[in-house]
Structure formats: structure tokens, C-alpha cells
Amino acid sequence: MSVSALSSDRQIENLIVRYSHLGDEGNLAEFGALFDEADFVFGELTLRGGKAIEDLIGSTLVVHEDGTPRTRHITTNILIEVDETNGSAVARSSYNILQTAPDLLPLQVVGGGRYSDRFVRRNDAWHFARREVTIDFTGDTRFHLKGQQSA
């Protein structure tokens, strides 16, 4: 099935989920490319373009020997509102980040929060226009974020 054959809701949901998969796989180049023509907002920081986001994530996340951050982003409560006439959409969702590492057992939640997204349709496909990431909860991030202190 081609992308254009999918409903707008489904295409947008796929983008939301692709973000999680690419991050969990450690594929930072494709992760950043999701925002080639989009804003990525994290607290007071706003970045635009794939390379800027790739560089930010690469300088922030711990990548383990297997080439991944050893995480699973679980995105839930996805609420999508599409304006087909204007080729725009908004979405809200919640996320939890699970992680395990040799020195971080058992599997645990290291963070959780919300995504607030805007999308635009270009060339019959949906793309991120803006993602705002809010962190509501954090756990033991020593093996997830660079520069964290040992417990």
C-alpha cells in the first residue's frame, strides 16, 4: 500500500511512531531528517532542520556498545486533529522512555512527558512542521543522558 493510500490520521500516526523507532535504533541521521523543514522545541531551545536536531541528540544521548541508546519510547494517548482543507494537522500524545543497560537493571522508566505536534501536507504526504517536547517526569538518566552524575 502506498503512503498516499493511507488515511491522513494513519500517515501522521506513522510519523509519530517513526520518531520513536529511529531514536531507539540510534539512527540519528534519519531521526533528524524528520525535521528537515520543521521546528523542534525542547524547553527554551528551538532548532530547525535535520542536521541541527541530529547534532543535538548526538551530543545529548548516551549511545551504548550496540549502537543504540538501549531505550524504548512508548507513545500513547495519541490525539490527532486533521484539517484536510488546509493541509494541516495537530496532535498531542504522551510518552514514556524505558531503558535498560548492563549497570541499569531491571528495565525502568527514565523519563516521561508530552509531545505537542503540528504537521503539514506537502506533495501528498504529511511531514512534521513542529514538535514540542515537554518532560514531566524523570528517573535514573545516568545511562541515557550524557553528563549525568553517578548515583
Where are these regions (language model features)?
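Beta-strand elements of well-folded, non-transmembrane domains
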Residues: 95-99, 119-121
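Short, low-complexity N-terminal intrinsically disordered segments enriched in polar/charged residues
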Residues: 1-33
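Short beta-strand edge/turn micro-motifs at domain boundaries
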Residues: 88-90, 112-143
